[in-house]
Each structure stands twice: as C-alpha cells, then as structure tokens.
C-alpha cells in the first residue's frame, strides 16, 4: 500500500481502497438477470451498496492472497495474510522472477526484525488502522458526493451488473480535504444489484483539484483510478484489480506522479484469530512450500 500524508492524503485514500479488505460472505448469485423495478432509484442502490461495503469491512474474516504490483520502477509480487493485528506481507518475486537466495534471506531477516521491533510493529498497525478509517470515511461519502444516472446492464466476469454514470453533486460540501477530490471527478460504477455489491469503480478527474485553496497542492486533470471487486472464495468479495494514474504537485515544489497497477489472486481463507507473528510464520511456510514444489519441478 502506498501511503502519503498532508496534501496528498486524498490520493492515499484512493490507493488504500485496493487493500481495504472490503470482503463479505454473501449468497452466490443464481445467475438471474439484474432486477430493475419501475421507478428504480440509482442513488438508493448506491446507498445500499455502500452500506454493504462498510459492513463488510467490519466482518470477521481473514484471507491469504498474492498481489502483483507494477510501477515504472518494475514489478514486485508479495504474499499477504490478514491477521487480527494487521496485514502481514512478504516479498516473493521481483520482475516476475523468484527471489535469489540472498534476496530471500534479506526478506526473512526484515520480517524477523519487524517482529522483534515492537515500536515499529505498533507504528505499522496504527498506520493500517488509520488508512482503513480514512477509506471508510471516503466510501461513506459516495452516495452524497455524486449524482448517479442509470445507463443499463452488462455482464462482467460472469456477474450481471447495473451500470451507473456519476458526476459531482453541486450541493455536496466536502467535510475534509480527503473528500475534495470528489468535486472534480466523474465516471461510472458497476453494482451487482441482488447482493448490492460494488463490482467496479472507474473515476477520472475532469479538472485540477486543489487542496487548501491550492496552497497545499493539487492533482492534475486526467488522473484516473479503477478498483475492481468480485467474489473470490466461498462467496467472499474483495478487491482483485486496481489501477492508478495521478500527477500533481504538493507544497508548491514536490511532484506527485503515481502510475500503479495491482492484481490480486490466489485467495484462500485463513483463521480469523491469527496474531501478526502467526501470520508471518504462515507466510514463511507458504514460501517454503512453493520453493519445494519448484525444486521438484512441480511434482507432488
């Protein structure tokens, strides 16, 4: 997860969406077409979907998963596991190549050092909690920050979804700098209507968006973010794809240039009561299992 502070806090919230862990067990779809009743209210559907996302974030679940993150500097792949004390992560590949023995040793040493550094571990946990709280505030704002227009239905990855176009609500008064980014953004939402779950958010800045009357910084027109969600295991929904393209300025001189694509896969359920240390051990066991399989040529 990319984290920024101060003038770029709104961007940090958008980035945090991919790892917010918006997952919830919901009944599997029966394959029926989306049911759109006469007098369908797009705003109300968004409100229901947002309520489900917030509820899902408070759910009792944990997953292990893999994230491939691509930036202009290259590609890094990490294995993650949710624990009751935060999300633990371990680097497993660079530029789609397995780590060298030296790199593996360095990564193991980093994890061990983190476990033995209580102050750093608490700082990491505090940061993750603050990121999650910012995400929740932003998600709660969606029904009021935009006006929504029904554009039809479509099928995406086997899901029948409703497409809603959104544009800023002129009556919306952003309660903080974080929400100011919504005043210059339009795009579309895809919502699975039976379960009222957000399947995709695609937003683009149609104008420069300033923070603190432009004194603290701004994001440039044309910036875009995409977040894709879907059921991944036993009906659980979570983020599977995220794409970010933003430029701007912070505090007059510091440039903001974020070009990131993340794809998450290999989801599986793990116990919800794992400690951070147990999560790290699980990551190590997973890594050792992959190495053993590779050394045996994939034979069981």
Protein language model regions, located:
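N-terminal secretory signal peptides that target proteins for export/translocation
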Residues: 1-4
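Intrinsically disordered, low-complexity segments enriched in polar/charged small residues
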Residues: 8-9, 74
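Beta-strand elements of repeat-based all-beta scaffolds
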Residues: 226-228, 239-241
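Bacterial N-terminal signal peptides
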Residues: 9-21
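Structured extracytoplasmic
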Residues: 25-186, 193-199, 204-223, 231-236, ...
